[in-house]
């Protein structure tokens, strides 16, 4: 899904840049600024996904609500 979004953004940027060649200078600045914002948008999605990645055992323990002490006791 993410690759589809990147392709869509790239197609939109190509369309904007081909039309931008026909624009006057102030309009070209606006288009360049919008393209830069669109280009930075997919990178910001990764920061919304969550914090650090967890191992499967950490995910299971957090879902089950097991205390960390019990988790460490099982490893000994």
Curated annotation (Swiss-Prot):
Subcellular location: Secreted
Primary localization class, coarse: secreted
GO molecular function: hormone activity
Residue positions where Alanine amide is found in the record: 73
Signal peptide bounds: 1-20
Expression by tissue: Optical ganglia of the eyestalk.
Keywords assigned: Amidation, Cleavage on pair of basic residues, Hormone, Neurotransmitter, Secreted, Signal
Cellular compartments per GO CC: extracellular region; synapse
InterPro entries linked: Pigment_DH
Coiled coil (residue ranges): none
Cited Pfam families: Pigment_DH
Keyword Signal attributed: yes
Keyword ATP-binding: no
Biological process per Gene Ontology, one example term: response to light stimulus
Role noted for this protein: The pigment-dispersing hormone causes the migration of the distal retinal pigment into the proximal end of the pigment chromatophore cells and thus decreases the amount of light entering the retinulas. May also function as a neurotransmitter and/or neuromodulator.
Family named by the database record: Belongs to the arthropod PDH family.
The protein's name in its UniProt record: Pigment-dispersing hormone A peptides
Species of provenance: Faxonius limosus (Spinycheek crayfish)
């Amino acid at each position: 899904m993410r690759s589809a979004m990147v392709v869509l953004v790239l197609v939109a940027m190509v369309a904007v840049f081909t039309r931008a060649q026909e624009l006057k200078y102030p309009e070209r600045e606006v288009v360049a600024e919008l393209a830069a914002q669109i280009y930075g948008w997919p990178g910001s999605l990764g920061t919304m996904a969550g914090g650090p990645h967890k191992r499967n055992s950490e995910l299971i323990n957090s879902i089950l609500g097991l205390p960390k002490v019990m988790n460490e006791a099982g490893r000994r």
